UniProtKB/Swiss-Prot annotation:
One of its GO terms (molecular function) is phosphopyruvate hydratase activity. It comes from Sphingopyxis alaskensis (strain DSM 13593 / LMG 18877 / RB2256) (Sphingomonas alaskensis). SMART domains: Enolase_C, Enolase_N. This is Enolase. SUPFAM superfamilies: Enolase C-terminal domain-like, Enolase N-terminal domain-like. Keywords: Cytoplasm, Glycolysis, Lyase, Magnesium, Metal-binding, Secreted. Pathway: Carbohydrate degradation; glycolysis; pyruvate from D-glyceraldehyde 3-phosphate: step 4/5. Mg(2+) binds at D242, E285, D312. InterPro entries: Enolase, Enolase-like_C_sf, Enolase-like_N, Enolase_C, Enolase_CS, Enolase_N. It comes from the Bacteria. It is found in: Cytoplasm; Secreted; Cell surface.
Length: 424
């Protein structure tokens, strides 16, 4: 009854107006699943390959008709007849069919679309929400959001090199309250920027991209907005950064050009340590470049005992890279992006490995998103306790927050919002 009878892919547009892959999976009993695949702007060199057409005469080369053809051709032919409830068999069949180490033949965007749509169809067949189908009866922890309210780096056209400045409403009592707090701080920040004559247009992830002078300038602006909104910085709300340091690592130096700095890995670690000392920053993502293992080790040794150090480009949601990082003592947290590895099974393997090593895990969106809210369900399914899904603007970001509010309501008294407990 849960055999796959049809798989259909199509080309749709993401939140940046670029093509992406959407997949429908239909089962023998009429159950149905649909998934749309996200896309990143700052991508790690070790991510699974997103297959693009390269035809400059169509969508400026960003079309995904090759990936869609893979879904409707090779993948559909291989998977029709398989049981949608056997997620690992489905995912392994696609990995074997692709036959490359980075999913470059069929495309991770094709493979992931099918993987997630099959899981949704299986959940539909069971009459279960996706978070319950994937996570079982223990799936009840709502994630604390990292809300990206000021953008720099690859996500903005301003002098700030750090890519994301985020607030985390750890003092809230529920996800619904956390979203309210975030919204109030977001609008307070907007008013403050406007009063200073600074831009209030939003970037890819819904955050503002004002022409501020430095990292500390951005942190001070956020701190003032938290206070003006009526919350206590360091207790109600803490801060988080995504440096995306790979983007400004050149010739062995971290070029923080907006501040006129050229730092060695050791100096970069000290730079971040000083920020953690002066502000209630509880989480730093990609504080070092993806292959600067010595830098990562220095940073982890320096502040890993007091600050969550999240590996995004470092680990790319890849169990093999994560395993090596754990052995080498690099970072203490895994950023989870389903399209970095390309299947649901491998994503869950990475989260499980992180948890067994006492690393935290943070479920994450990409800068190019859609209305698909799958990551909200996966955050609850994995009990990871944290989610990155942008600011309090743009419907592609709010779709995830709204889904979390619905899940919390559905769980009722079983729902748990961990707050500051996520940091131990």
């Amino acid at each position: 009854m849960t055999a796959i009878i049809d798989i259909h892919g199509r080309e749709i547009l993401d939140s940046r107006g670029n093509p992406t892959v959407e997949v429908d999976v239909l089962l023998e009993d009429g159950s149905f699943g649909r998934a749309a695949v996200p896309s990143g702007a700052s991508t790690g060199a070790h991510e699974a390959v997103e297959l693009r057409d390269g035809d400059k005469g169509r969508y400026l080369g960003k079309g995904v008709t090759k990936a869609v053809a893979a879904v409707n051709g090779d993948i559909a032919e291989a998977l029709v007849g398989l049981d949608a409830e056997d997620q690992r068999e489905i995912d392994m069949a696609m990995i074997d069919l692709d036959g490359t180490p980075n999913k470059s033949r069929l495309g991770a965007n094709a493979i992931l679309g099918v993987s997630l749509a099959a899981a949704k169809a299986a959940a539909d067949a069971r009459g279960l929400p996706l978070y319950r189908y994937v996570g079982g009866v223990s799936a009840r922890t709502l994630p604390v959001p990292m809300m990206n309210i000021i953008n720099g780096g690859e996500h903005a056209d301003n002098p700030i090199d750090v890519q994301e400045f985020m607030i985390m409403p750890v003092g809230a009592g529920s996800i619904a309250e956390a979203v309210r707090w975030g919204s109030e701080i977001f609008h307070t920040l907007k008013k403050g920027l406007s009063q200073k004559g600074l831009a209030t247009a939003v970037g890819d992830e819904g955050g503002f991209a004002p022409n501020l002078a430095s990292t500390r300038d951005a942190l001070d602006f956020i701190a003032a907005s938290v206070d003006q909104a009526g919350f206590k910085l360091g207790t109600d709300v803490v801060l988080a950064l995504d440096c995306a340091a790979t983007e400004f690592f050149r010739n062995g130096k971290y070029e923080i050009s907006g501040e006129g700095l050229s730092l060695s890995p050791e100096q970069m670690a000290e730079y971040l340590a000083a920020l953690v000392k002066d502000y209630p920053i509880k989480s730093i993502e990609d504080g070092m470049s993806e292959d600067d293992f010595a830098g990562w080790k220095a940073l982890t040794d320096l502040i890993g005992g007091t600050c969550q150090l999240v590996g995004d480009d470092l680990f790319v949601t890849n169990p093999a890279r994560l395993e090596q990082g754990i052995k080498d003592g690099l970072a203490n947290s895994l950023l989870v992006k389903v399209n970095q590895i390309g299947t649901l099974s491998e994503t869950l393997d990475a989260v499980d490995m992180a948890h067994r090593a006492r690393y935290s895990a943070v479920m994450s969106h990409r800068s190019g998103e859609t209305e698909d809210a799958t990551i909200a369900d996966l955050a609850v399914a994995t009990n990871c306790g944290q989610i990155k899904t942008g600011s309090l603007a743009r419907s592609d970001r709010l779709a995830k927050y709204n889904q979390l509010i619905r899940i919390e309501e559905e769980l009722g008294d079983m729902a748990r919002y961990p707050g500051a407990a996520i940091f131990g």
